[in-house]
Amino acid sequence: MSVADVKKGVEQKMQRSIEAFKNDLAKIRTGRAHTGLLDHVQVDYYGSMVPISQVANLTLVDARTIGVQPWEKNMVAKVEKAIREADLGLNPATAGDLIRVPMPALTEERRRELTKVVKSEGETAKVAIRNLRRDANEALKKLVKDKEISEDDERRASDDVQKLTDKHVAEVDKLVQSKEAEIMTV
């Protein structure tokens, strides 16, 4: 293993942490409708639980309404029930074979709770990134111990790892700020 391998590996892992954080943020409901909100809803499809996207077409009807069109008419009631029981605070309404899912307006108190959740998720993502930094630095120290690189190379590489860490932590902070702004906009 070389210094380049360590740096490349840690950067890829940090980028994956950022992607996972973005996915977590997408699940947090804001006042606006987006189809990603229903991504983790599971529907009972002939005895097995499948994601809603595998049994229905999700569309945005308008800024505050998601349209869910099940591919099979007999699935309408099951899809509606799954959305209702997903504990998202949503109340779907069926019109024929189209399920409309209106986004209720968030109360001020709920907005504040959601910003706390966003900050907490952000901290978790930052901790994950810092743990990756620690692992990379340990790998570099092992290379020095095994006499594969010099201490100067290790110092330069750990500085580079720190720069990567700072860059990714700043990206998490930016994502947290934009999500908070999105939540607090009425």
From Swiss-Prot:
The keyword Cytoplasm applies. Pfam families: RRF (PF01765). Keywords: Cytoplasm, Protein biosynthesis. GO terms for molecular function: ribosomal large subunit binding. It is found in: Cytoplasm. GO terms for biological process: cytoplasmic translational termination. GO terms for cellular component: cytosol. InterPro entries: Ribosome_recyc_fac, Ribosome_recyc_fac_dom, RRF_sf. Its main location: cytoplasm. Belongs to the RRF family. Responsible for the release of ribosomes from messenger RNA at the termination of protein biosynthesis. May increase the efficiency of translation by recycling ribosomes from one round of translation to another. HAMAP family: RRF. This is Ribosome-recycling factor. It comes from Burkholderia ambifaria (strain MC40-6).
